[in-house]
Amino acid sequence: MGKDYDCDSPPSRKFQNNWPAGVTSTGETAPEWAWKNVQEGVGTGAIRLLGKVGEVDPPHVVLPLSVEMGKPRLITDARYVNLWCDPGPFTLDSVGQVPETFRRDGLLCNYDHKSGYHAFGFDESEQGYFGFCINGCYFTFAAGCFGWNCMPEIYHVAHMALLEFAQKWFDIPSLGYLDDALSGSLWGGGADPVELHRSARWGVEVLLWLNFLAGYSVSIKKSVLEPCWRITWLGILIDAGKNMFYIPPKKKEAVLQLLCGIRDRGSISVRLLESLAGKCMSLHLAVGEAAKVFTRAFFDVLIRIRKGEIGTKKQAISLFG
């Protein structure tokens, strides 16, 4: 049974952590990986240790922790405090804007922030609003955390302001998607490949400089800082030399394996159906209207579920008879 609230801010509550079974891709259990991640956060200043349970006052709301197991990520289940938050709508850039943003004969680069939410520090007087408990200790967040529904808007507004500044004052074309950005050769000038390469490299160097001044860290492993003709951004392979979009082989294989698994089982959970529909629609730029036609039945089922016409969100749905 749910609980009703009639107040302007969340009452104090303590929730238990929700650890998934199994091991992460690093070979650790969820609590082990989470504890290591929390210790790293304390070391960087993104998380603050309050003290041991029973020796210090807990945060106003003790939120449950969980771990995304595939690509290990610490998740703060902030659904409780999110009920009292009202983030504004915003629109993210997409791969579909590449043709209108970058020159057709230009090269491309991209960078990806590392722990980007940690660039947004919380005022010390507000850090006790919510936190968590692990291994008998209370912690609060000293910077942004994954799970609080206000963070995407804050992140988007701040990062796009940086990119727009670079576009206005340095003429650097770019697109941004939360912690990920794409840049390319500058407009103007001739079509000399050497000059196109030089301008693209200069552009990404300026963007990196601005990011460091703004307090962001960049993941070298996830970034492509050397200008190139072929680059994968937001799951789509962009061929700037041929002016074409492609589906990366790994992504194509992942979707095919998912579809074959569903076919063999004969049914699918609602959560997996939502994920499958999203994955297929993300291929729209490369396969065109076929993505909409293929997923039409998926979205029809999801709409009927939301209207209460069929099943519940916990039931499995049969797509094959």
Regions found by a protein language model. Name each.
Residues 1-26:
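Non-catalytic, polymerase-adjacent accessory regions of viral genome-replication enzymes
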Residues 21-157, 246, 250-299, 306:
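Catalytic-core region of right-hand nucleic acid polymerases
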Residues 64-65, 71-74, 105-109, 172-175, ...:
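Beta-sheet entry/capping signal
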Residues 77, 112-114, 147, 169-193, ...:
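Catalytic palm active-site di-aspartate
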Residues 106, 115-118, 217-242, 284:
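Short, conserved secondary-structure transition motifs
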Residues 152-207:
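Active-site palm subdomain of RNA-directed nucleic acid polymerases
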Residues 190-213, 241-254:
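Helical (often loop-to-helix) elements that flank the catalytic cores of nucleotide-handling enzymes
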Residues 294-321:
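Conserved, charged catalytic cores of large soluble enzymes
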